[in-house]
Amino acid sequence: MGKGTVVGTAVVVCAAAAAAVGVAVVVSRRRRSKREAEEERRRRAAAVIEEVEQRFSTPTALLRGIADAMVEEMERGLRADPHAPLKMLISYVDNLPTGDEHGLFYALDLGGTNFRVIRVQLGGREKRVVSQQYEEVAIPPHLMVGTSMELFDFIAAELESFVKTEGEDFHLPEGRQRELGFTFSFPVHQTSISSGTLIKWTKGFSINGTVGEDVVAELSRAMERQGLDMKVTALVNDTVGTLAGGRYVDNDVAAAVILGTGTNAAYVEHANAIPKWTGLLPRSGNMVINMEWGNFKSERLPRSDYDNALDFESLNPGEQIYEKMISGMYLGEIVRRILLKLAHDASLFGDVVPTKLEQRFILRTPDMSAMHHDTSHDLKHLGAKLKDILGVADTSLEARYITLHVCDLVAERGARLAAAGIYGILKKLGRDRVPSDGSQKQRTVIALDGGLYEHYKKFRTCLEATLADLLGEEAASSVVVKLANDGSGIGAALLAASHSQYASVE
């Protein structure tokens, strides 16, 4: 082999080696660049999560301050302060069911696109609810934007049809008029136990000629047109109905809270502690107050940029601030907004932000709950929800665990804030502590209703644990939180019974 050949071969070998080194360097740089990009993505995700953790933090001291603010706003509302966020509406319910009620009573529950008609046969303290029946009726969409007469005539006609199906289990004493409790879950200025004028329609209703009118009178005239002899003896909202239903089962029920799509609370107040009450005090000495607590607001509430943006984009900015932090309508939406931030800032679901994640209210709270309760080792159920709802085909295990943590942060804040509100009611009633005079502790029951509380187990568990923590071990031993499943419907019938025109002759 000649010298030239050897040199040439050496040059080729060196060139190949250099090329290999070059490729290795490029590959190494790409790997390092990819690794650095991944580390940067994780750093950004951690920064977003850390900020959420800080802004959503609800230490016990903060919750006590929120409860104090709740008490202050309750007192302002009871004084009729025009600027008070809590309206503290007088319900005119001063006689709650005792369990002694007898007879046949009806209820009409109108609060959305459906309404329910209910009848119960009450058998007194021994037999309680002897029989109960109900029917649910969908309201045709055109009646939700029609006239007042058309809507109430439709309701009265359905009520009359329901009355005609009374069976042998239901008995009306001869010579007596049927009586009805009317649950009307729209803003009303109540003027007596059986009258109230509509302030405004909500929930998709827009009917001319009803605002400012007495809704009981509207229903009564419609029943007369149908030839239905029935008297409305109680007009209540759903939270007051839940309180009545709870009291019928347990005489120690002092308040009711609804935690569902929306939220509200009602409680039994001493009538002499209501400065805006005019006229004679009720014989019972008590009055049920409808707090409309969803509108509670305070600088102490731990609001974040996500809350502020949600409120700004809502149909009622500046209103229902508390509701927007704790109710089922909004918890899933808050989670969506945080996930969207993570998708934009930290590519949580890949380089492209899922289109559906931009859609407001696409993530409902029941879906959030299902993800939050996933106990599989790889969070496969959570991943399936993200795929079905947001269209994300493949999510990393890290992305799923981050989503789970976001659900936990939002649910925990909501539950702890709700517990602070309940603690505020207990403080207002003086039921938040052990009697200092050594007298016997008074048992206090809070009736809770609504799908959020009933079905979202982690929310419910957190709420109850937080309330116990706020009360302290000794005081907590005399406070009971009890599910009052669907109490508002039967509660209206029970209030019709306790305010019956025949009650004095029983």
Curated annotation (Swiss-Prot):
Known pathway: Carbohydrate metabolism; hexose metabolism; Carbohydrate degradation; glycolysis; D-glyceraldehyde 3-phosphate and glycerone phosphate from D-glucose: step 1/4
Family: Belongs to the hexokinase family.
Species for this entry: Oryza sativa subsp. japonica (Rice)
Catalysed conversion reaction: a D-hexose + ATP = a D-hexose 6-phosphate + ADP + H(+); D-fructose + ATP = D-fructose 6-phosphate + ADP + H(+); D-glucose + ATP = D-glucose 6-phosphate + ADP + H(+)
Designated name of the protein: Hexokinase-6
Enzyme nomenclature, EC number: 2.7.1.1
Reported induction: By glucose or fructose treatment in leaves.
Gene for this chain: HXK6
Effect of S185A: Abolishes glucose phosphorylation activity
